[in-house]
Amino acid sequence: QRGNASPALSELPLLQETAISLGTAIEQKKGKEKESVSILERYCEALYEAYLTLQEGLSGDASGEIAADQLAMEQLATDQLIKAGNCLKDLKEVLERDCKRQVVFLLHSAKHFASLRPLIDALREREDTEVKLMPIPYFDRMGDGSLSEMHYEGENFPKEYPITDYRSYNFLAELPDCIVMNSPYDAFNPVWSVDPFFYSEKLKQYTNKLVYIPWFVTDEIDPENPEDRKAFYNMQYYVTVPGIFHADYTIVQSEGMRAAYLEKISRFLEKEMEQKEEHPASKEACLKEKSTEELMQMMQQKIFGVGSCLLGEKEGQGTKEVVESLKQILFEKK
C-alpha cells in the first residue's frame, strides 16, 4: 500500500527466511549445484533489495507526507518484488525437474517382488519420479511373541534393480512422497514380523501417501455365500490388521474383494465399538475418537478394487489397472 511500507518491512524478512530454509533443504537432499538453489538465491536478493529500498524511503519521509522521491522508492521496490515473483514462477518449473517425486517400495521377501515389479518398472520410466527399492529385514517370532532370528533377502532380488540400503536411508530427511508396503500386520502376525521400525503406524510419520498392496491374490470371497464362510472368517488375519487402517490407500484385486474387505471391516468395527467401554486402552490409536460410520466412510474412500499385478494382463483387473491407480494416487491425489 502506497505510503505505508511497514507491513511489507515486517513480511519480507519472513519470506526470506522461508526461502533460505527451502534452499538449505534442497542442498541437503539434492546438492548445491541444483538450479532451484540459485533461483532461491536470486529470490532472496530481490527481497533484500526491496527491503532496503522500502526502509530507505520510510526513513527519508521525515515530514510524514508522501514525497515524490518516496513514491519513486516505492515504485523501485515494487519492481524488485515483481522480480522476486518471477523467480517464484521459474522456481516452480525447475523444482518439478530438480525435486522428483520419490516412491519407496518396501518388501521383506524377494519372492513377493513379482507383486510390485510392474509398478516399479512403470515408475522407473518416468523422468519426474525417483524409485527406491528397499528390502527390509524380518524376524521369526517365538511362542511368547518375542522376535528371534533376523532375515534379510536384499541379495536375492534381481540384480538389474538397484537396492537402497535400509540402514543408510534417512526417512526423516527424505520424507518420500509415497511409501508402498506389502506387509500390513505390524505386531499382529504370530509367526514373523518385519522390523518394528517399518510398522505402518511408524511409516505414516514419513509420508502423506502410505499405500498397501497385498503380495498375494485369493479366490473371490462373497460374505453372503455359505461356501465362502471359512474364507471370509480367515480374512480377519489379513484385513482387520493395523496396516489396512493406517494406510492412506489400499489396492486390492477386484471390486468384489473390495466389498468383502469393507464387510469384514464393518463387522470388526461393530465388535470393537461394543468393547470400547470395557477395554478402551486396548483400541488401536487409529480407531479412537471416531464412530463406526466415520471409520467406514474413511475406509470406503481408501480401499480401491482395482486389480493385482499377479493377475498379469487380465482384463479390467490386471497390471495395467494397478499401474494407472498408483499413478493417480501419486500424481493426482493430494
Regions found by a protein language model. Give the residues of each.
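Structured N-terminal alpha/beta-domain signature
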Residues: 297, 306-321
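Active-site and donor-binding regions of nucleotide-sugar-utilizing enzymes
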Residues: 101-299, 303-305
